[in-house]
UniProtKB/Swiss-Prot annotation:
Classification via CDD domains: F1-ATPase_gamma
GO annotation, cellular component aspect: plasma membrane; proton-transporting ATP synthase complex
Family stated for the protein in its record: Belongs to the ATPase gamma chain family.
Topological relation to the membrane, as annotated: Peripheral membrane protein
Cell location: Cell inner membrane
Protein name, as recorded: ATP synthase gamma chain
Gene encoding the protein: atpG
Keywords associated with the record: ATP synthesis, Cell inner membrane, Cell membrane, CF(1), Hydrogen ion transport, Ion transport, Membrane, Transport
UniProt GO BP: proton motive force-driven plasma membrane ATP synthesis
One GO molecular-function entry: ATP binding
NCBIfam families: ATPsyn_F1gamma, PRK05621.1-1
Pfam short name (any one): ATP-synt
Length: 288
């Protein structure tokens, strides 16, 4: 029964794969809870600093700051692209990259150049294959994002904006909606869209600034950008673990179905072989 041996070998192979995918599912489930807790704990700070930025922008409409001023002509944009270091997380990276490519094509049609700061090995590898301009990057971020590892690459492209080398700064990442759903998001970081902030927080406060409004805004903008980048990376990590858990569960279920089909095929082949042997025995006995 050469066919039977081949089927048994396939069954063992699929069972081994199923053990791996089940283990990866369990690990992803554990990590998913931790990343979601980290993401949710970071949200209040990010929301509060956005609120403060809205109030400061509204109470100082005549103050000129690079983070608030729109450039007359946009010749170059910067993009912070957040992806994962590892695969096996469904279409998470593919969707984020597809969204980035759509924006990049739109900018290219307008003659706008694109500089990219990339977080995550998957995005970095994809962009280098396409010879896109990656001005800074950070990979192997681990399961817990460290501010020190994020600030270096991000500060490089932020400084380029403040120095006038780029005219807009955007961030692309995977927004965590729930365990089953994550979607790519594109947000403009600089210049700040004050009208959106003001509509989000319609009331205002009056502030007294020490020593002056520019000094406060310089620090506030830096903290704002740090919180946005950290929040985006945290959201992306929560999305990664959720997508990986779902993908590994689907792989485990598919493996179980494949094993059942192979067992059925094996039993049919074995039954056919036994029937053939019995027929040959009966035919031999009749001939005698």
């Amino acid at each position: 029964m050469a066919v039977g041996k081949e089927i048994r070998s396939k069954i063992k192979s699929v069972q081994s794969t199923q053990k791996i995918t089940r283990a990866m599912q369990m690990v992803a489930t554990s990590k998913m809870r931790k990343t979601q807790e980290r993401m949710r704990s970071a949200r209040p700070y990010a929301e509060k600093i956005r609120e403060v930025m809205a109030h400061v922008a509204e109470t100082n409409p005549d103050f000129k700051h690079p983070a608030l001023e729109r450039r007359d002509v946009v010749k170059r944009v910067g993009v912070i692209l957040v992806t994962t270091d590892k695969g096996l997380c469904g279409g998470l990276n593919a969707n984020a990259l597809r969204t980035f490519y759509q924006y990049a094509e739109r900018w290219a049609e307008q003659g706008i150049e694109v500089d990219v700061c990339c977080f995550g090995q998957k995005g970095y590898a994809a962009l280098t294959r396409l010879d896109m301009k990656v001005v800074s990057s950070a990979t192997q971020l681990g399961d817990t994002p460290q501010q020190e590892k994020l600030l270096g690459p991000a500060s490089h492209i932020v400084r380029a904006y403040l120095d006038g080398e780029i005219d807009e700064l955007h961030i692309v990442y995977s927004k965590f909606l729930n365990t089953m759903k994550q979607e790519p998001r594109v947000e403009q970081l600089l210049p700040l869209k004050t009208e959106e902030l003001e509509s989000e927080f319609p009331y205002s406060w009056d502030y007294l600034y020490e020593p002056d409004v520019r000094g406060v805004l310089d620090v506030l903008v830096r903290r704002y950008l740090e919180s946005v980048v950290y929040q985006a990376v945290s959201e992306n990590m929560a999305s990664e673990q959720s997508a990986r858990m779902v993908a590994m569960k689907a792989a485990t279920d598919n493996a179980a179905q494949a094993i059942e089909r192979l067992k059925l095929t094996y039993n049919k082949a074995r039954q056919a072989a036994i029937t053939t042997e019995l027929s040959e025995i009966c035919a031999g006995a009749a001939a005698v």
